[in-house]
Swiss-Prot record:
Transmembrane segments: none annotated. The record marks H186 as: Transition state stabilizer. The keyword GTP-binding does not apply. CDD domains: HP_PGM_like. This is Probable fructose-2,6-bisphosphatase TIGAR A. GO terms for biological process: apoptotic process; autophagy; negative regulation of glycolytic process; regulation of pentose-phosphate shunt. PANTHER family: FRUCTOSE-2,6-BISPHOSPHATASE TIGAR, FRUCTOSE-2,6-BISPHOSPHATASE TIGAR A-RELATED. It is found in: Cytoplasm; Nucleus; Mitochondrion. InterPro entries: His_Pase_superF_clade-1 (IPR013078), His_PPase_superfam (IPR029033), PG/BPGM_mutase_AS (IPR001345), Phosphoglycerate_Mutase (IPR051695). Its EC number is 3.1.3.46. It is an enzyme of class 3 (hydrolase). It comes from Danio rerio (Zebrafish).
Amino acid sequence: MLAFGLTVVRHGETQCNKDGLLQGQKIDSLLSDIGIQQSEAAGQYLRDVKFTNVFVSNMKRAKQTAEIIVRNNRTCHDLELVADPSLIERSFGIAEGGRVIDMKNMAKAAGQPLPEFTPPEGETMEQVKLRIKDFLKAMYQRIANDHQDKVQDGGTSSADESTEAPAGLANDGVSSVPVHALVVGHGAYMSIAMRYFFEDLKCPVPRGLDPAQQFSICPNTGMCRFIITLKCSSVDIALSDIKCVFINRRDHFKTN
């Protein structure tokens, strides 16, 4: 068994975010001044949290956010940032570059909830889930290869098994976990990933979490954290357990 922490962070604000425009995959924006400030604040919040691996979407807004967070960290500033195209934002097809409110109106006209609506030429939720599965498989393999010395025999793991609500600290859930991956990605992609974790993988909902928050769009530089346990053998690596510590945390905004 190999237990590791997984902290997922949405990129900082871009001008398109501020203007209410859909970026998707065609608009590869850099961070706005506010987005840089948000990323610096996220980096300061996580500065004493040890990461052993960093994965990032290869879109500019995510890479810039990851670089700022890692630069502020006291233990992982020299880690390789592994750029993975499986982490890029959901494609919104012909709606990209247009206003978010216009896509909401398109979904309403089609009689569908916004998260489930697919604009022409866009990606369906199921297509994004396939990319999520591809990324998880690659991440599991990379972590197992990088941390073979942390694999334990039997059904126990070094993860914190506490069922108490998180204390609101930056290292909640990962203080006793020697392997910890940082992933920096995108809002719609993260929302679908949460659906996959909670609905498909049956991850328990954290105590005290408002169910309406489960699948809401994470704010810019908002954070989600999970503890994942892998079953490792000479022929296979498989998910054994997943627990959620928190989702959509934005405590570092207080420092802005």
